[in-house]
Structures are given as structure tokens and as C-alpha cells.
């Protein structure tokens, strides 16, 4: 179904979820939680992982994001007992749409605490490569960035990705979870909060990343009903350009 979305004068509500359920049944629409394409994975630490997850979620070619803990040696870290791990974002992406180098370009330019200021391990700047090609691209990219920023010294660590521990459910898709009725209408289990395609995209767009025109272009891929899309349109438009925050 093709839908022309127009801005609403009043704040759209999703309190009555029966409207969404009826649309899903009548239009044979369901939220798209998985996209069947060949994926590659990248893992970055760049400060608070809430903002990073929104940034990459609304990026074209990104299919899934999960926040978690990695880069250390302690077992089973949690937010309250992180040990020597760092807050990181794991990204599944379509390499035919966006490259690892392009993901790195976003990485270098969107650190919450900057690249040249030493910071505690929790918020460290970190690239965890998944294969030899990523290792080479990461080191070359860091060298280019260091030359660009000289005489400042980039503190980013590059290491092999070993264990990754998903963060607690309340950290996953944090901006989307702030829209409780919308999140409920998407049938998101704790596992789907980590893996869902539509949750990944909306977590970025609802935070103001990507913009309204890009949202319109991608909305068809998400399995949203007219009511869900109208709600999202309003909030994407309201939040566009606000900038990332934690």
C-alpha cells in the first residue's frame, strides 16, 4: 500500500492500539524485524551508546544495531559492573549499500567526548575489527584522521573483536522505547529490541537523525501501518536537526 503522509496539526496519538491492530489485519501489514540480505558487522565504542545507536540506526544501509559491552576481559559485564569493558555499538550493515570506511567516517566525526581527550574506559574511543580487511581499513583510516587533526593525538584504540555482551533491555533502542505506545504496537520482545530492523531505523529517525525526506523514502521498508507512519512522521519532523544526546 502506498501512503501519502501529510503533517498533522495536532499531536497524533497511539493510545488506542486496536486501530493499529485492525490496520495490520485489514492491510496484511506487520513490522519488518528482519531483512534477508547478506550482512557484515562492525563494532565501535564512541562514548554513550544511546546516541551512537540512533546515529547509525537512521543511516542508509544499516540493518541492525545492538548496544553492549566489549573490549575488556571481565566476564559477564553489566551496566553496574562493567569491569574493564567499554560501551559499544554492534552494527549489522549491507556492504553493497554502505562500506566499512563510510561507517568509520561517521565514527570519527560523532564522538560524544571527542577523539583526543583521555576518558574513562566506559566511554573510550574503540574500534573492534571483525576480520583482517577491517583491521587494515581501520588503521589506515585512523592514520588519515591523525594527519588531519595534528598536532592533537587521537586516543582511539583498535583491537580484535572478541566477546560482545548485549546490554540490558532498557538500554536497547532507548529513544524508541521513550515512545511507549509505538514500541508496544511493534510487538517488540526483549530479543527483538536487540535485533529488529524496524526498531533500529525508528530509534534513529525518532531522535531526529536522517530527516523527514529520508524517513519518507525508507518508511515503505519497515512494515508500518498508516497510523504508525503518521505518528512517526510527526515526531521525525519535530525532532529533525536537534542533534544527538545522552
UniProtKB/Swiss-Prot annotation:
Keyword Disulfide bond on entry: yes
SUPFAM superfamilies attached to this UniProt entry: Peptide methionine sulfoxide reductase (SSF55068)
Enzyme class: oxidoreductase
GO biological process: cellular response to oxidative stress; determination of adult lifespan; response to oxidative stress; sulfur amino acid metabolic process
Family matches, as Pfam families: PMSR (PF01625)
GO molecular function: L-methionine-(S)-S-oxide reductase activity; peptide-methionine (S)-S-oxide reductase activity
Description of post-translational modifications: Conjugated to URM1, a ubiquitin-like protein.
Reaction equation(s) it catalyzes: L-methionyl-[protein] + [thioredoxin]-disulfide + H2O = L-methionyl-(S)-S-oxide-[protein] + [thioredoxin]-dithiol; [thioredoxin]-disulfide + L-methionine + H2O = L-methionine (S)-S-oxide + [thioredoxin]-dithiol
Record's keyword annotation contains Oxidoreductase: yes
EC number, UniProt record: 1.8.4.11
Keywords: Disulfide bond, Oxidoreductase, Redox-active center, Ubl conjugation
Record annotation: effect of changing residue 232 to S: No effect on methionine sulfoxide reductase activity and still lacks methionine oxidase activity
GO cellular component: cytoplasm; mitochondrion
Disulfide bonds: 48-246
Active site location: 48 (cysteine sulfenic acid (-soh) intermediate)
PANTHER family: PEPTIDE METHIONINE SULFOXIDE REDUCTASE, PEPTIDE METHIONINE SULFOXIDE REDUCTASE MSRA 2
Record's protein name: Peptide methionine sulfoxide reductase
Organism: Drosophila melanogaster
